[in-house]
C-alpha cells in the first residue's frame, strides 16, 4: 500500500509541474489579443487611408518584428505545436479596416492548419474592406465584428458577398 501511495503522489507531482500546453484555437484568446485600432484611421478619412490602393503596404510592420512576436506569443498562448510555419502572425482587426499595425494586442499566432484558418480570415478581411469602402458598413462596425468573433462575422458577411473578389 505504501508503494501505491508514493506512486500516486509522484504522478500528481508530475502533472502539477508539466507546463500547460494548448491546441491552437481558431479564435484568439481575448485576454491576450483583444484587438486594437489605428487611431489615425477614422470613418471621415477612410478614402484617404484604408480605401487607397496599397495603403496597408505602407503601414505593415516588418517581418523581423512579427516573426519575433509570433514566437513569443506562441509561448504565451501555450501552443503544443511550436512550429512557427504552422501559424501566421495576423492582425485580429485587419489593417485594411483600420487595425493597429504594430500593437501586440492586435496580433496573434493564427493557425494555418484548421477549418477556420488564416486563409478564411483573409477572405473576411477583403469582404469587410470592400463593404467599408463602399459604405455598406461603418468602419467601427467592421472593426467590432472582426474583434468580437471573426468566425461569426465570416458566417454573417462572406456568403452574402461572394461577388467581392
Q: Where would I find each of the regions flagged by the language model?
A:
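Nuclease and nuclease-like effector domains acting on nucleic acids or nucleotide cofactors
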Residues: 2-9, 15-87, 96-165
Amino acid at each position: 500500500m505504501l508503494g501505491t501511495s508514493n506512486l500516486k503522489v509522484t504522478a500528481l507531482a508530475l502533472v502539477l509541474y508539466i507546463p500547460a500546453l494548448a491546441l491552437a484555437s481558431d479564435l484568439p484568446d481575448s485576454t491576450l489579443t483583444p484587438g486594437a485600432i489605428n487611431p489615425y484611421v477614422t470613418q471621415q478619412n477612410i478614402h484617404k487611408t484604408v480605401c487607397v490602393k496599397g495603403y496597408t503596404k505602407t503601414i505593415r510592420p516588418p517581418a523581423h518584428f512579427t516573426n519575433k512576436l509570433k514566437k513569443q506569443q506562441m509561448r504565451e498562448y501555450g501552443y503544443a505545436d511550436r512550429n512557427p510555419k504552422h501559424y501566421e502572425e495576423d492582425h485580429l482587426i485587419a489593417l485594411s479596416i483600420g487595425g493597429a499595425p504594430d500593437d501586440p494586442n492586435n496580433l496573434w499566432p493564427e493557425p494555418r492548419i484548421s477549418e477556420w484558418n488564416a486563409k478564411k480570415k483573409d477572405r473576411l478581411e477583403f469582404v469587410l474592406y470592400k463593404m467599408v469602402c463602399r459604405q455598406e458598413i461603418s468602419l467601427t462596425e467592421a472593426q467590432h465584428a472582426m474583434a468580437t468573433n471573426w468566425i461569426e462575422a465570416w458566417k454573417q458577411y462572406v456568403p452574402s458577398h461572394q461577388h467581392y473578389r
